[in-house]
Regions:
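General structural feature for long, well-ordered alpha-helical segments within catalytic domains
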Residues: 32-36, 84, 108, 112, ...
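Active-site-adjacent helix/loop patches that line small-molecule binding or acyl-intermediate pockets
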Residues: 14-126, 134
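Structured C-terminal helix/loop/strand segments within mature extracytoplasmic catalytic/sensor domains
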Residues: 151-302
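Glycine-rich ThDP/TPP pyrophosphate-binding loop and its adjacent helix/strand module
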Residues: 125-128, 149
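Active-site SXXK
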Residues: 1-9
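Generic secondary-structure signature for well-ordered alpha-helical cores
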Residues: 9, 41, 45, 93, ...
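Secretory/export targeting leaders with adjacent low-complexity proregions
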Residues: 136-139
Length: 302
């Protein structure tokens, strides 16, 4: 967000797809790799400058193609390469040292922490900092504050105490997610289909260890966040659909493109359906209009 606030997208001529990749957890497909490379080139950087580490693409077909071609896995395949590339450009723009952009004490990371605190409505001094899987600082928040942040992200107009530049940056990030869902996630992924189905009414994004967060702009402003306690990934999407169903967000029922995620099948080695994943745990919901941002933060654990 500090990069967009400072006019980085305009300064480096980033496309909508490149902005979307900068806020993505992508699946490492060839189009994602090419987009990350394009971001880097616009700032005079290369894959060698990324500090996210080399990983296989999470997209199985793409990973198999890399192995089949005898190519090494690259930091560009890392699902966070887009945001790392954008951080390098932010350093170039703001005059910061790009070699240590992942250090929690780096001035760019301090700016990012301040924006997280602002949108979450939570003091920066109370946010604990760890190290994420991609080596960037990761911020520990109450789950209700993550929900509040997503409500603020999709809120119309300007928020209280939000600068015009910050509001413009926020709207640009959200607009990119809506316009380029594939670049936020990947082929066939839930988040891609979820963004497409929303048609501008909501955004959503997964996090590691069973986290999912949603910002709903219509039919009413809502922020939703939850974490699967044991960190499992497979319950996230049925839980997300179940919460939205309970809140009456779907108009005309669950979109057809998401119907397979309502109760995903568990298949055995022969492809026989032997079970299903069911969202069956009540979700705690609470709204705190006095302390939180506009909209209802809905938080839960499953």
């Amino acid at each position: 967000m500090p990069f967009l606030e400072a006019g980085g997208a305009e300064r480096f001529g980033l496309t909508t797809e490149e902005v979307a990749l900068a806020v993505a957890s992508h699946s490492g497909e060839p189009a994602h790799v090419a987009t990350a490379e394009s971001i880097l080139e616009k700032g005079g950087f290369s894959a060698a400058d990324l500090r996210c580490g080399a990983t296989p693409p999470s997209d199985e077909a793409s990973a198999a193609a890399v192995v089949r071609d005898g190519r090494p896995f690259s930091p560009l395949h890392n699902n966070c390469s887009g945001k790392h590339a954008a951080m390098l450009l932010a350093c170039r723009l703001l005059g910061f040292d790009p070699a240590t952009y992942d250090d929690p004490a780096h001035p760019l990371q301090r700016l990012i922490l301040a924006r997280v605190a602002f949108y979450a409505g939570h003091p920066a001094s109370k946010i604990e900092i760890g190290v994420d899987g991609c080596s960037l600082p990761v911020f520990r928040l109450p789950i209700s504050r993550l929900a509040a942040a997503y409500a603020r992200l999709v809120a119309p107009g300007m928020l209280d105490d939000e600068s015009p530049a910050a509001a413009k940056a926020r709207r640009r990030a959200v607009a990119a997610m809506i316009a380029a869902p594939f670049h936020v996630s990947g082929t066939g992924q839930f988040t891609t289909r979820f963004l497409e189905a929303g048609a501008g009414r909501w955004i959503g994004k997964e996090g590691a260890e069973g986290v999912y967060a949603i910002g709903v702009a219509a039919p009413r402003l809502l922020g939703i966040a939850f974490k699967i306690d044991d960190g499992a990934a497979r319950p996230r999407f049925p839980v997300a659909i179940d919460i939205l169903s309970r809140l009456g967000i779907w108009e005309g029922g669950v979109p057809e493109s998401l119907s397979g995620d309502v109760r995903p099948a568990i298949l055995n080695a022969r492809g026989l359906r032997v079970g299903e994943v069911v969202a069956a745990v009540p979700v705690e919901a609470r709204a705190d209009a006095a302390k939180g941002p506009p909209g209802d933060p809905v938080a839960g654990r499953a």
